[in-house]
Amino acid sequence: MTEKKSFYITTSIPYANGAPHIGHAYEMMTTDALARFKALDGYDVLYVTGADEHGQKMLQTAEKQGKTVEQLAAENSKAFEDLSIALNCRFDDFVRTTEPRHKAVAQEVWRRMEAKGDIYLEKYSGWYSIRDEAYYDEKELSKQEDGAFIAPSGTPVEWMEEDSYFFKLSAYEDKLLALYSKHPEFVGPNTRRNEVESFVKNGLRDFSISRTTFNWGVPVPGNDAHVMYVWVDALTNYLTGAGFLSDDEKFEKYWPCDLHIIGKDILRFHAIYWPAMLMSADIELPKRVFGHGFINVDNEKMSKSVGNVIDPHDLIEKYGLDQMRYFFMREVPYGKDGSYSHKAFVNRTNADLANDLGNLASRSLSMIAKNCDGKLPKIENLTSEDDALVDLAESA
């Protein structure tokens, strides 16, 4: 018997400073659907998800809520894992970035990049968004009437100055462009690839990869005064889930990752920083990064201030799990933004599930009850036409 071909698929790992919403649920459900289809196609599928638990934003949220950061991480990571289970997502591993196995992976990748000569220590000064956990060039910012700058995401930024390790991202500009040219499928959909290529062609700057103003993170090897920038730590979770350092046989089987499913807002980290880091560490690159769109509510962006953030558990309870999974995968063009509303949900459920599929099932069962004594007919001999259909299905 021939061994099944492997297929490794991941969600991004959501940031554990808040509760999950329908945007997180959408990514979990669509990734699970893709994993199931690959399994039906005969692949040995590894589906990994998890939670990103480090960073300054976690510390600030824990302080506001009167909790320890460890408590916040444990509670919210469990909330994301519980949601994935409630959505009937058949994930194989849930990676928490506070786990010892992940710390070892992140530090090994750092050592390899450092050994390559791609990490150096220097004074950093620039604009930083705590909420985005991202640095921005001033030309990317918008200036408000009061003189304050805001990031492209609409979040406030503050001027940061501290000693920091830097990664030589600028050294990988040509290699990244060559990657996109040779493997245009690396970034999807096509509109996202164009965005990524345009960004890289405008010139890449080395980026800060450590912090000294707090200690909630993975310590930098050889210098405990620094912790890794949260994205350097978080991105390596995909290696952790594949068994890097902990299970050589598993890693050889499933790496490189076949498909990273992520939100379009974190495409830069996955399509630029991540492959550059892997090139530096001499680790094979993933095959594809796909950036899906956002889920809006009544065509408006979800916002706590507006009060339109939807708890996925409420939708499961109100409509049912199968209906919820069907709605989001049928209603939203994959790769583009979509919108949820009660009216759209009810209309889609009634039109497709109750009327079309429901009527088909009802009529089929009625015919079986009437003509086959209520039992499924047993297939005795296949015709040549039947054999042709079976062959076509097996070769698909």
Give the role of each language-model region:
Residues T98-D118, Y128:
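Feature captures the FAD/FMN-dependent oxidoreductase FAD-binding
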Residues K123-S125, Q144-G147:
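Short metal-coordination and nucleic-acid-contact micro-motifs, chiefly zinc-binding Cys/His arrays
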Residues A73-D92:
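A glycine-rich helix N-cap at a beta->alpha junction
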Residues T2-Y43, V48-T49, R101-V105, Y124, ...:
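Structured secondary-structure scaffolds
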Residues T61-A74:
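A charged helix-plus-loop insertion that forms the helical arch/lid used to bind
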Residues S129-D132, F149-S153:
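Short cysteine-rich clusters marking metal-coordination/redox-active sites
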Residues A51-K57:
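Short, charge-patterned binding micro-sites
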Residues D52, C372-S395:
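Acidic, turn-prone loop/beta-hairpin segments
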